[in-house]
From Swiss-Prot:
General function of this protein: Claudins function as major constituents of the tight junction complexes that regulate the permeability of epithelia. While some claudin family members play essential roles in the formation of impermeable barriers, others mediate the permeability to ions and small molecules. Often, several claudin family members are coexpressed and interact with each other, and this determines the overall permeability. CLDN1 is required to prevent the paracellular diffusion of small molecules through tight junctions in the epidermis and is required for the normal barrier function of the skin.
Subunit structure: Can form homo- and heteropolymers with other CLDN. Homopolymers interact with CLDN3, but not CLDN2, homopolymers. Directly interacts with TJP1/ZO-1, TJP2/ZO-2 and TJP3/ZO-3. Interacts with MPDZ and PATJ. Interacts with OCLN, CD81, CLDN4, CLDN6 and CLDN9.
Disulfide bonds: C54-C64
Region annotation (Disordered) ranges: 190-211
Subcellular location field: Cell junction, Tight junction; Cell membrane; Basolateral cell membrane
Pfam families assigned: PMP22_Claudin
InterPro entries: Claudin, Claudin1, Claudin_CS, PMP22/EMP/MP20/Claudin
Disruption phenotype: Complete perinatal lethality. Mice are born at the expected Mendelian rate, but die within one day after birth, due to severe defects in the skin barrier function, leading to rapid transepidermal water loss and dehydration.
Molecular function as annotated in GO: identical protein binding; structural molecule activity; virus receptor activity
Membrane-topology descriptor: Multi-pass membrane protein
Spans traversing the lipid bilayer: 8-28, 82-102, 116-136, 164-184
The protein's name in its UniProt record: Claudin-1
Length: 211
């Protein structure tokens, strides 16, 4: 029997990670302008996401420009977009599958083993979703580091990690942890031994033997 509390905890953590992946994908602060160096501009903040780039003025006014051309984007941004969207879609599938396998739900009550396997499959899908998010954020973050330390990159064109990137890392961690907890509900095989057959007891003879 699977631990219902462990299942519920894993489902909640993985679901929170899935929500975090959506928030991270939508936020425009994947990388923010770096103020390191001599060229320091404090009147505005420049940041860029997967779908747009924005400039925030000190007065509170924000101007954003959506990336219109798909072919004009670099390969890292395109791959990050694809992985994040795939991770979100997989997380949605995992939520439906895991819900069926939860012990607190009444689906598949007649088949306890199949119900537990549904929870395990949902946990595995959550693991794949978390890996997709982790690879996407790590790849994008590595690109930021490479460009920051590249001597050919101008000082006024260097960026640092943004809030959305940290949100994505936290979301991936929650999805992975929740997926592991759900996968721990895998039904264990029990060794069955053959039941010994009872031998009939000899019945005592009712009469006496005569020679």
């Amino acid at each position: 029997m699977a631990n219902a509390g462990l299942q519920l905890l894993g489902f909640i953590l993985a679901s929170l990670g899935w929500i975090g992946s959506i928030v991270s994908t939508a936020l425009p602060q994947w990388k923010i302008y770096s103020y390191a160096g001599d060229n320091i501009v404090t009147a505005q903040a420049i940041y860029e996401g997967l779908w747009m780039s924005c400039v925030s003025q000190s007065t509170g006014q924000i101007q954003c420009k959506v990336f219109d051309s798909l072919l004009n984007l670099n390969s890292t941004l395109q791959a990050t977009r694809a992985l994040m969207v795939i991770g979100i879609l997989l997380g949605l599938i995992a939520i439906f599958v895991s819900t069926i396998g939860m012990k607190c739900m009444r689906c598949l009550e007649d088949d306890e083993v199949q119900k537990m396997w549904m929870a395990v499959i949902g946990g595995i899908i959550f693991l794949i979703s978390g890996l997709a998010t982790l690879v996407a954020t790590a790849w994008y973050g590595n690109r930021i580091v490479q460009e920051f330390y590249d001597p050919l990159t101008p000082i006024n064109a260097r960026y640092e990690f943004g809030q959305a990137l940290f949100t994505g890392w936290a979301a991936a961690s929650l999805c992975l942890l929740g997926g592991v907890l759900l996968s721990c509900s895998c039904p264990r095989k029990t060794t069955s031994y053959p039941t010994p057959r009872p031998y009939p007891k000899p019945t005592p003879s009712s009469g006496k033997d005569y020679v």
